[in-house]
Design a protein with these regions (language model features):
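His-enriched metal-coordination microenvironments in redox/metal-binding proteins
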Residues: 203, 214-220, 242-244
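Intrinsically disordered, low-complexity segments enriched in glycine/proline and serine/threonine
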Residues: 5-7, 14, 62, 86, ...
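Short beta-strand edge/turn micro-motifs at domain boundaries
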Residues: 223-243
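Flexible low-complexity loop/turn motifs enriched in small/helix-breaking residues
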Residues: 22-208
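Bacterial Sec-dependent N-terminal signal peptides
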Residues: 1-32
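Short, surface-exposed coil-to-beta transition loops
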Residues: 194-197, 217-222, 236-237
């Protein structure tokens, strides 16, 4: 009887893993040009399955994310204006980290050009919380995870290995760009497989929401929503612009 219970438990655990993880990656121990199309079909199916199970419980943050990802919701917009041969898919991280601060921050003392005012005194456990949300999937969208990114990086090469950087597989890189955006990090050894603008983090205080955005693989800014009369109002001009 115990053996049967153990077997059933293992089967349930495996079923949960298959349903919730990127189980399709096990089909592709080595990504090649021949199986790349199938890989993207499975990746798209995985992303759609995540969308179908997402529980939305923070309408304000969802609205903020949707507004900043609006360009990717428009049919046919899979690249920045001016680029030729846009890729087939948009790619966004599966999770966006949200830092929640249960207090007001001083938006006067801390000038907007310095970005979100992190210089708070030591906070108690009940004054902040860090969690994450799954953003809305854009038009022709795919969710990127660290495992999927690793698979793609192996396919195109150019990764850092100690003090050396692997040779880039230019043939694989060319075909991959037909499917998704691909940018090489300017320090070398890593890739960006995401669409831009890209939300990297959200800081949510009682009177301020700061959305940290990468506008490209080498530039970024923050968008502020300041609370006025019990409503968060978007500041038209971005704050805290930076260049790497």
């Amino acid at each position: 009887m115990r053996n049967k219970i153990f077997i059933i438990t293992i089967m349930l655990a495996l079923a949960t893993l298959v349903c919730s993880g990127q189980s399709f990656l096990s089909k592709f121990p080595k990504l090649t040009k021949k199986n790349l199309s199938e890989f993207f079909s499975d990746w798209e199916a995985y992303s759609d399955s995540i969308v179908s199970r997402v529980v939305k419980n923070d309408s304000l943050i969802d609205m903020v994310v949707a507004y900043n990802y609006l360009p990717m919701q428009l049919e046919g917009r899979t690249c920045l204006p001016g680029k030729e041969a846009p890729p087939k898919y948009h790619v966004v991280p599966q999770y966006i980290e949200v830092e929640r601060y249960y207090l007001d921050v001083d938006t006067t003392v801390f000038s907007p050009r310095f970005g979100f005012p992190y210089h708070c005194s030591e906070l108690k456990d009940n004054e902040y919380r860090i969690d994450s949300i799954i953003p809305q999937l854009p038009y022709r969208g795919l969710y990127l995870t660290s495992d999927i990114s690793e698979t793609l990086s192996t396919f195109v090469g150019g990764r850092r290995n100690g003090d050396k950087i692997e040779k880039i597989n230019k043939g694989n890189l060319k075909i991959l760009k037909k499917y998704i955006p691909v940018d090489y990090g300017h320090w070398g050894g890593y890739w960006w497989f995401t669409s831009f603008p890209l939300i990297t983090n959200i800081c949510y205080a009682d009177n301020l929401i700061a959305v940290k955005i990468r506008t490209s693989w080498w530039t970024g800014e923050e968008t502020w929503y300041i609370k006025k009369d019990d409503e968060f109002v978007r500041r038209e001009e971005p704050t805290g612009k930076w260049i790497e």
